[in-house]
Amino acid sequence: MTNQDKKAWLLQYRRLDERIDRLEKEKARWIERATKMSAPSDGMPHGSGVSDTVGLAVSKAADLAAEINREIDRLADLRREIEAAIQTVEGSVFREVLERKYIDGDTWENIAVQMHYSYMHVCRLHGMALTRMML
């Protein structure tokens, strides 16, 4: 497996985490829609349009909640796999670079600052860490 393949595999975690965030925002929008909708209060009989719309919004929110839970389970499984792969790398500095980038989602610049290295050195460490990682 090439370093590019390893990097793509590691990036799955961040992408899935971002997907969960998007799903949670979408669920919140459906909940907001459901709470904003209300039946007319003029005492006159009306069709069931508002009720159906509220029901649809609640149903969409519930479907999204179930999907979010499934994705969170996948995320936890993927995190365990990635952490196990990172642990195959000898050297705590290499592991730290991989963890900060692929689990924490830090930028290269932030990793360099936090680890007290130059940006270029962190990039070199990253390349060496990928080469050492066993998948």
Regions found by a protein language model. Name each.
Residues M1-T88, L135:
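N-terminal interaction/assembly modules
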Residues H126, M133:
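DNA major-groove recognition helix of helix-turn-helix
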Residues N110-V113:
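Short alpha-helical "recognition helix" segments of helix-turn-helix
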